UniProtKB/Swiss-Prot annotation:
GO terms for biological process: diaminopimelate biosynthetic process; L-arginine biosynthetic process; lysine biosynthetic process via diaminopimelate. Its cofactor is Zn(2+); Co(2+). This is Succinyl-diaminopimelate desuccinylase. Transmembrane segments: none annotated.
Amino acid sequence: MNDVLDLTCDLIARASVTPEDAGCQALLAGRLTAAGFACEHLRLGEVDNLWATHGSGAPVLVLLGHTDVVPPGPREAWTSDPFDPQIRDGVLYGRGVADMKGSVAAFVVAAEQFVAAHRAHAGTLAVLLTSDEEGDAIDGVRRVANLFLERGQAIDWCITGEPSSTERLGDLLRVGRRGSLSGTLTVKGVQGHVAYPHKARNPIHLAAPALAELVARQWDDGFESFPPTSLQVSNIHAGTGANNVIPGELQVAFNLRYTPHWDAPRLEAEITALLDRHALDYALRWHRSGEPFYTPEGRLRSVAREVLGAFAGAPPEESTGGGTSDARFIAPLGAQCIEVGPVNASIHQVDEHVRVADLQALPALYRTLIERLLIE
């Protein structure tokens, strides 16, 4: 094995199911401290966060990652124990190897190598880690970003190690993410016998026209590299289970993934107005997961395009697809944000894995990005 493999395996062996860190950050802080970084442990609620810096002043480049993982599911479904890293046929298996302990290990190795070669580098190189990315994402980077605002901590560039690649390492550069807004709609009716509909008010029938209008609406035509805003109904529930009872209440869960054309308050107002037009007796609860962010052409994006193109052998696709990431909390600080990481084909799945060759290449990729941004 080599250093990044050893470190990745050490991290996988720590069963840090969100929001647990299981000692990952202490291990990483020990290495970063030995390399000359100043490390600050931020315990917020039940969540561990680590802020490590080397150098001072601008520009500030942050390597952003998380040490928590999603639950592995049934252990018997895995070919080997999810927290016992195994290499088979040139592939490393284990929960979190792709999302994103491999990237975190590569960050640390790259940071160690960079500061060893450039002790007096310009600006600040920082590593920010949390154990609350896969869970509620309340006491992790969201709260740390608020703390940075209070401190006046500026961030110029942020590289998140989310698994962005699709087929081969470096084939995709994530330059933004859509916003995410979830709603839970409760429509009230009057329960009754199906044989006497005039004595009841069926909330399914009452809500159907409004729901049809919601799902048929074209919210926008997309933006730059963003696909159009999408509303998806994810759950509908009503009734007692008996086929002779008109339900007294309908519950509908839905989610919007939206472009920078919108923000959460405007979407909430649009949907509330639509429901009001249909004269429904309803209650609506919202959950804002994050606003969209987009990194336009600039130094970070151009450098990343060149570096990934050299590693992958072709210019990367530049995309804003996928789910949310913690970069959504860093972008509002004024930072340009990108995501660069390993192939994402197996994330959150049984037998999560990364090619060993890709993992071995990651530190050099990250180090090259750091050098291009802080040295040139």
